[in-house]
Amino acid sequence: AKHRGLTMFFLDMRSEGVEIRPIKQANGDSGFNEVFFTDVRIPDSQRLGGVGDGWKVALTTLMNERLAIGGGISTGFPEIKALAETLPLASGQAIDDPAVRSKLADWYAKSAGLKNTGARAMSALSKGEIPGPENSIGKLVAGGMMQDIAKFALDLQGLGGLITDPEIARSQAQIQAMLMRSPAVRIEGGTDQILRNIIAERVLGLPEDMRADKGLAFNQIPTSESK
């Protein structure tokens, strides 16, 4: 009931009345913006899908986004493998340390799984099929893996991991940037918690979460003001 009546449009960001203000982030980048609309009109020629089909279009967009994020981002496995092969530890090269090798083996297996999952999804796309909820797996695994690898790489380097200037140490700076970027990957396109629910309910067929608002329109949901 909540999704009826929603219609999606695309907007030319150069349209009159559109103001974009970059948001300065803690890591110094501006990957997000505030967008203000002043008397902006969008013609029907910029409608996506049918009238009332906005929710369907939004879900299709999100599924494609999750597929792109899960299959397109670098999880950092090539970087951590290269680091382990060249980084000296007190006991020898990092790659020879059993604890490091165990981590690398785990991440290699996950990387192979992501690659094969992405290949199945791309095969389905080539046949004109719409990405399904199973593509949430790739995005969920890739985001967590990226963050875990970045943290481990920094710990492995010790004080050397604090270097952020690519002119001094390019690989260390890349890992720093990866660590700063990784929390956003676990939020954009659907948080880890949302994706776990999708996988549980729509892929594994587990019971849905209890919801008091299920089947009710927004204006029918009880609130403190309606009492």
Model-based region annotation:
Residues 6, 32, 52, 111, ...:
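Active-site lining segments that contact anionic ligands and/or coordinate catalytic metals
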Residues 2-6, 94-102, 171-176:
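Glycine-rich, flexible loop segments associated with nucleotide phosphate handling
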Residues 1-85, 206-227:
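FAD-binding core of flavoproteins
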Residues 68-129, 133-152:
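Extended amphipathic alpha-helical segments enriched in small hydrophobics
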Residues 136-227:
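Alpha-helix capping/hinge segments and adjacent helical runs
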Residues 50-51, 96, 171, 187:
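Residue-level signature of the cytosolic catalytic core of signaling kinases
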Residues 16, 55-62, 81, 116-120, ...:
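Short acidic (Asp/Glu) and glycine-rich catalytic loops that position anionic groups and cofactors
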Residues 22, 61-67, 100, 126, ...:
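Short beta-alpha connecting loops at secondary-structure transitions
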